[in-house]
Amino acid sequence: NFIFASISTLAREDVLSQFARDHFDYIIVDEVHRAGAESYKKVLDYFNSKFTLGMTATPERTDGQDIYRLFDYNIAYNIRLQAAMEAKLLCQFHYYGISDLTIDGLSVDDSSDTRFLTSIARSRHIKEAIDTYSMHEKRKRGLIFCRTVDEAKELSERLNTLGLRTLAVTGEDSEAVREDAIQRLQSDRRPDMLEYLVSVDIFNEGIDIPNLNQIIMARPTQSAIIFVQQLGRGLRKAKGKPFVTVIDFVGNYD
């Protein structure tokens, strides 16, 4: 007997109180790098299972929380990105760092105003880079990560006017809208199929699109965790996908 639940649901008092503390023999926690959050602590502190397994691709946190301590520093298995790629568990990636664009004498970077980040000039700059480095993909399927929701929406509109098929998907959208957007990206047959989903961070984790073949970073991040999460969206192996193309417009490679 198995129960699948989100932490947000399980942490609710009316749900958690339905279970005895020793109700579960095994507890498996996905995305356990979030376990420093109060909702995770509440659930993990409540249950007294015989065995608890935490899984994450990014165990390190930037807020000082020690996830390893929650498991008494017992590591069942550990494999890093490079080792996973060498073992052919993940697909290879081709990485292209694109130099900053200068608009009206100003260099577009992470501190730039949204009007520059979503300008026609920068949108064309992004489109030209996509055209240049997409020569190997017969059918483009990509995620574009932006800094803000407004930027994601405006950039999507700009890229659509330049001939790409994109859709901005944000936390404001329902689960049904997000699922439909993913299906449109995956499909080869739908007349409304998409080439790119543009978002801020809702696709950093928790999605599975094996045939994704492009990751486009139009946002900066000082977090190695977020960088690896976003890169990891494209590293699932799939038939006919020898590698994923990563195009970085904001110098994350520094």
Per-segment meaning from a language model:
Residues 15, 153-154, 164-203:
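Conserved helicase ATPase core of P-loop NTP-dependent helicases/translocases
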Residues 1-26, 37-42:
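Conserved helix/coil segment N-terminal to the catalytic DExD/H
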Residues 12-14, 88, 197-212, 232-236:
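SF2 helicase motor core recognition
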Residues 3-6, 50-57, 196-199:
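Structural recognition of the conserved hydrophobic beta-strand(s) that form the central parallel beta-sheet
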Residues 223-229, 233-254:
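Conserved segment of the helicase C-terminal RecA-like domain
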